[in-house]
């Protein structure tokens, strides 16, 4: 039985392509020494600063950082542990700063009797202060350091 030369060529080409695909699976990775899904130990979490001192802000409208640990705080649709101290009626009892008046405004600027739902989840903007080292060099400069001295006299 004779096989047509075209079929023989196609069969050989398919075998060669299959072998090439199998070899391509073992191609060197471009991501370095570790395989992409390898298990690597996570670095330790940075220590939370818990001195309860307010930290200065670097720019207007910067959300203040949280100067205490919030580990274990419940923050869900049903409960917000932050409001137990920072809500208007409780802040004086525990010497905690009251949440900003802007947290009582809706999108249109209308004042509400309680915290606006869009401001309810505190950790969307506020984070605990830690002693973590920056991952990149911080080149932020305050606006006052960028202004020429001649503008300050005006």
From Swiss-Prot:
Binds 2 heme C groups per subunit. Disruption phenotype: Deletion mutants show reduced nitrate reductase activity. Pfam families: NapB. Belongs to the NapB family. GO terms for cellular component: periplasmic space. It comes from the Bacteria. It is found in: Periplasm. It comes from Cereibacter sphaeroides (strain ATCC 17023 / DSM 158 / JCM 6121 / CCUG 31486 / LMG 2827 / NBRC 12203 / NCIMB 8253 / ATH 2.4.1.) (Rhodobacter sphaeroides). The modification Pyrrolidone carboxylic acid is found at residue 25. Heme c 1 binds at residues 68, 82, 85-86. Heme c 2 binds at residues 103, 122, 125-126. The keyword Electron transport applies. One of its GO terms (molecular function) is metal ion binding. Component of the periplasmic nitrate reductase NapAB complex composed of NapA and NapB. GO terms for biological process: anaerobic respiration. This is Periplasmic nitrate reductase, electron transfer subunit. Residues 1-24 form the signal peptide. Induction: Induced by nitrate. Not repressed by ammonium or oxygen. The keyword Signal applies. InterPro entries: Multihaem_cyt_sf, NapB.
């Amino acid at each position: 039985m004779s096989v047509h030369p075209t079929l023989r060529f196609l069969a050989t080409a398919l075998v060669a392509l299959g072998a090439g695909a199998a070899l391509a699976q073992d191609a060197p990775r471009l991501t370095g020494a570790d395989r992409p899904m390898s298990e690597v130990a996570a670095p330790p979490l940075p220590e939370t600063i818990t001195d309860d001192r307010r930290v200065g802000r670097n720019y207007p409208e910067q959300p203040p950082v949280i100067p205490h640990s919030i580990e274990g705080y419940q923050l869900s649709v049903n409960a917000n542990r932050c409001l137990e101290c920072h809500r208007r009626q409780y802040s004086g009892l525990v010497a905690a700063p009251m949440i900003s008046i802007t947290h009582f405004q809706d999108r249109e600027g209308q004042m509400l009797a309680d915290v606006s739902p869009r401001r309810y989840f505190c950790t969307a903007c506020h984070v605990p202060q830690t002693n973590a080292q920056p991952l990149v060099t911080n080149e932020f400069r305050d606006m006052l350091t960028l202004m020429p001295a001649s503008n300050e006299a005006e």
